[in-house]
Amino acid sequence: MNALTSLKLIDGKATAARVLAEVREQVQELRQGGVQPGLVVVLVGADAASQVYVRNKVLRAEEVGIRSQEHRLPADTTQAHLLTLIDRLNRDPEVNGILVQLPLPAHIDEHCVLQAINPLKDVDGFHSENVGGLAQGRDVLTPCTPSGCMRLLRDACGELRGKHAVVVGRSNIVGKPMAALLLQADCTVTVVHSRSRDLPALCRQADILVAAVGKPRLIGADCLKPGAVVIDVGINRINEDGQNHLVGDVDFAAALPQVAGITPVPGGVGPMTIAYLMKNTLLALDLQQQAAHQERTACLSPC
């Protein structure tokens, strides 16, 4: 890596390490007060990639002092059985965060399962209560990847107010919540998608460009304004010169001379996603404690 690349690189690994250190310190303070946050990860089936993701999440939780559990269910698990497990976890006071690893087997209704999770324990931020709360600017659990991207942007850019942000992709997991978080930060936001016309012209307006479409090297130099900051959420496996490579949605080599900062793939956004899962577990605990306090206060109030 040359000096120019180093200067422009937005290092997700280093930032994630700082986030995890912050979480570890908060967890230590909580444990001194007799409280240990708890995270449960549920995996249905034996998808190899999902197994790796789940293991990484559990390991990170253990590293920062969060009590973690795995529930590994066979691929033929019924929806009713999965919903029963979620109901039990919802009622368990020692469980602060619940994550159901996606994708689920085809016979299980993903929407139904995600809606069954208590919104205050929904550390993925996918429940409609949290999605709506994000749109309204309320203090709710938000999806981990967009939240991690916002930390990278604030560290790289400082003040975001007034900047023009272009989000390429409109998925429920990244694109839409990313746009909502950027709006909350007082950015001017454009969302570009598969039906948008003249992708390069729209992208060239961006002070901040977030690419999240899952198309290798879709964003070339012709899509970038000089001095833009680029967050590449895409992670695509391609075969090139007889070897497998992981590349982003942005053509890194073509983009580098033009941008002020860019995340690499791998090592950019990925580590931030898991780091913000840990932060969300602490936020979930805090929201649950607030809700319990409000409930106690309401019970003590005169009619």
UniProtKB/Swiss-Prot annotation:
Q: Name one GO cellular component term.
A: cytosol
Pathway as given in its UniProt record: One-carbon metabolism; tetrahydrofolate interconversion
Reactions the enzyme catalyzes: (6R)-5,10-methylene-5,6,7,8-tetrahydrofolate + NADP(+) = (6R)-5,10-methenyltetrahydrofolate + NADPH; (6R)-5,10-methenyltetrahydrofolate + H2O = (6R)-10-formyltetrahydrofolate + H(+)
Documented EC number(s)? 1.5.1.5, 3.5.4.9
Q: Which GO terms describe its biological process?
A: L-histidine biosynthetic process; methionine biosynthetic process; purine nucleotide biosynthetic process; tetrahydrofolate interconversion
**What SUPFAM superfamilies does this protein's entry cite?**
Aminoacid dehydrogenase-like, N-terminal domain, NAD(P)-binding Rossmann-fold domains
| Range of residues in the leader sequence | none
Can you name one GO molecular function term for this protein? methenyltetrahydrofolate cyclohydrolase activity
- Write the record's keywords in alphabetical order, separated by commas: Amino-acid biosynthesis, Histidine biosynthesis, Hydrolase, Methionine biosynthesis, Multifunctional enzyme, NADP, One-carbon metabolism, Oxidoreductase, Purine biosynthesis
- Protein's job: Catalyzes the oxidation of 5,10-methylenetetrahydrofolate to 5,10-methenyltetrahydrofolate and then the hydrolysis of 5,10-methenyltetrahydrofolate to 10-formyltetrahydrofolate.
Q: What is this protein called?
A: Bifunctional protein FolD 2
